[in-house]
């Protein structure tokens, strides 16, 4: 009992009388400055402080705990000074070049010869440098080189819009075809161009330009062949809303080294449609019509231009007049006067033809002289009959 009473006489270290001393240990404005406030672990008493509390008394323990501890460098300043990550924009400011560059290896493209039948699924027009193909059909593209590129060379295919107002946009599939279950397990659903029959194809998205491309290793031609053939597929129609939306596109094929340096470049236009043969025939006819020279109207002319048929038709050449004279014996006065009038009409026509083009009517004196020579006696006078109901 004596030991228990002696224990009760000892003041507990964390009683209400010591709360004011603990409160004074807290820094000022602790609530309003969370950055400068120490962590919660520093506010709690450690095991050493508790032992000092019992051994040396509460006053000495509070003085030791109130001593400022060495502050560790806080990474708050470095965190605030770190720049925020840049925002990624959906459009690209750089446009890939579409100029032909054969390079030192003589890189060029080739296509199979095909007609314009309705049953054809892929056809190439040399005059337009344009490929017409159906959706998701095989499009063989031949790669020709004069000398073999070094090992590690790759072939990249990328689609861009042809017109300048659309070049900065990324060519991708429409939302409808993106949701279609036609993936081969390698190509992402938003990529337009795919490689058929090559498991080594890599589908890339550029981190800076966000453009889609497909890369395959370059393989030299097989024995007995002069070129390498890659089979491409176009997975969206040119007329799809939300995708190409009838905007013409170009496919750029580049030959790149193992370090990414450009070895060659070539391009061609592509139209993905339902009837490639019909569309190729129509566009070639329109191209030929546009290539024909059209006559230009004269300057400062307000009159309507004549059609091409009348302006382009060659005018007949004028035949030289015959200068010989012939004598014709005619029986009967009436016949003589009739042949005389016919001869005068022919003479008048020849006189008009000899004059300049600007003078379309003969001179009045010439008509008077011809009229005076006519001595026709069989002139009929026509009288107007007046009926009973006429006014």
Curated annotation (Swiss-Prot):
Chain segments carrying region Basic (repression of DNA-binding): 366-385
SUPFAM superfamilies: p53 tetramerization domain, p53-like transcription factors
Region annotation Interaction with E4F1: where it falls in the sequence: 254-292
Phosphothreonine PTM sites in chain numbering: 18, 282
Entry's localization field: Cytoplasm; Nucleus; Nucleus, PML body; Endoplasmic reticulum
Residue numbers spanned by region Transcription activation (acidic): 1-44
Intervals of motif [KR]-[STA]-K motif: 368-370
Matching InterPro entries: p53-like_TF_DNA-bd_sf, p53/RUNT-type_TF_DNA-bd_sf, p53_DNA-bd, p53_tetramer_sf, p53_tetrameristn, p53_transactivation_domain, p53_tumour_suppressor
Motif Bipartite nuclear localization signal location, chain numbering: 303-319
Region (Interaction with WWOX): 64-108
PROSITE patterns in UniProt: P53 (PS00348)
Compositional bias ranges of the Basic and acidic residues kind: 281-293, 348-362
Segments of this protein annotated with the region Interaction with CCAR2: 1-318
Motif (Nuclear export signal): 337-348
Ranges where the record places region Interaction with HIPK1: 98-368
Protein name: Cellular tumor antigen p53
Gene for this chain: TP53
């Amino acid at each position: 009992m004596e030991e228990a009473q002696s224990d009760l006489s000892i003041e507990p270290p964390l009683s209400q009388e010591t709360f004011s001393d603990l409160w004074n240990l807290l820094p000022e404005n602790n609530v309003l400055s969370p950055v400068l406030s120490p962590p919660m672990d520093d506010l709690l008493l450690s095991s050493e402080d508790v032992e000092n509390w019992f051994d040396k008394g509460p006053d000495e323990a509070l003085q030791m705990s109130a001593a400022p501890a060495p502050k560790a460098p806080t990474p708050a300043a470095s965190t605030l000074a770190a720049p925020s990550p840049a925002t990624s924009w959906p459009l690209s400011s750089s446009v890939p070049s579409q100029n032909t560059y054969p390079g030192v290896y003589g890189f060029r493209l080739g296509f199979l010869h095909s007609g314009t039948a309705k049953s054809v699924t892929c056809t190439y027009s040399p005059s337009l440098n344009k490929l017409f193909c159906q959706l998701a059909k095989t499009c063989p593209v031949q790669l020709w080189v004069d000398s073999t590129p070094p090992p590690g060379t790759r072939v990249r295919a990328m689609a861009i819009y042809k017109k300048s107002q659309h070049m900065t946009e990324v060519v991708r599939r429409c939302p409808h075809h993106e949701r279609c279950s036609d993936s081969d397990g390698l190509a992402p659903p938003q990529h337009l161009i795919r490689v058929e029959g090559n498991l080594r194809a890599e589908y890339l998205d550029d981190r800076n330009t966000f453009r889609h491309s497909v890369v395959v290793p370059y393989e030299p031609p097989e024995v007995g062949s002069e070129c390498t053939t890659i089979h491409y597929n176009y997975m969206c129609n040119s007329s799809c809303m939300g995708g190409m939306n009838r905007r013409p596109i170009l496919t750029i094929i580049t030959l790149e080294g193992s370090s990414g340096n450009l070895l060659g470049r070539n391009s061609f236009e592509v139209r993905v449609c339902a009837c490639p043969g019909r569309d190729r025939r129509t566009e070639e006819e329109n191209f030929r019509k546009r290539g024909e020279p059209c006559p230009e109207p004269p300057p400062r002319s307000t009159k309507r231009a004549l059609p091409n048929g009348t302006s382009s038709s060659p005018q007949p050449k004028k035949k030289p007049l015959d200068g010989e004279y012939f004598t014709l014996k005619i029986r009967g006065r009436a016949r003589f006067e009739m042949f005389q009038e016919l001869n005068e009409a022919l003479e008048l026509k020849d006189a008009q033809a000899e004059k300049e083009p600007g003078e379309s009517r003969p001179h009045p004196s010439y008509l008077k002289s011809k009229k005076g020579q006519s001595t026709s006696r069989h002139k009929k006078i026509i009288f107007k009959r007046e009926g009973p109901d006429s006014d």
